[in-house]
């Protein structure tokens, strides 16, 4: 789930996500390990992807949460990520689940996908990490027939979201609850990422249009939100809940 914000910074970003790899799945929403949330994501994938068997490129695959779900549904998946550490976890899980024949991994930038064609290009919570999201989306258009983005309004500067984030952070410190990541994402890096802090999904839809994809449509993932809220202990599910969306588009009109 990684991409460098500028030329020369890739080592720094790769190191961040490599350091995150060993503990990343400790957060249930990262690993999609909660049975209810897993079922909600399985339904979301089934509705957005073409019928299996089909070839899937999972950009920013991370530890393979989405790749493995897709493989379970019968898809042949190629996982792409900048971090070797994250992909090592994905490969380990694929082997443990008996899915190694359906999931293969490649280390590389999200903006430089492997040669296609793929029936569908998917990503989950990745666009915010990319310094040129329109350019990346355009590169995916070169290798994919359909685009499926699973996104949310992360890091919103809205007052209500910031207030909830502040309350959750303070409460986690009091309760000594481990954070979602090994360290905060560097602020100077965030400043270079156009989609890092979104008040709404409008910039996401605009980026897809600008990249040249056709027939763009969007739907709120209310079942995923509901499932994620339920598996978190109160009040974290409420404090940390954010709107999530699936955006689908096609290479040809």
Model regions and ranges:
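Short alpha-helix
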Residues: 195-212
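Class I SAM-dependent methyltransferase SAM/SAH-binding core
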Residues: 57, 63-111
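Conserved class I S-adenosyl-L-methionine
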Residues: 1-52, 148-178, 222-224, 239
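Short conserved loop adjoining the S-adenosyl-L-methionine
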Residues: 112-116
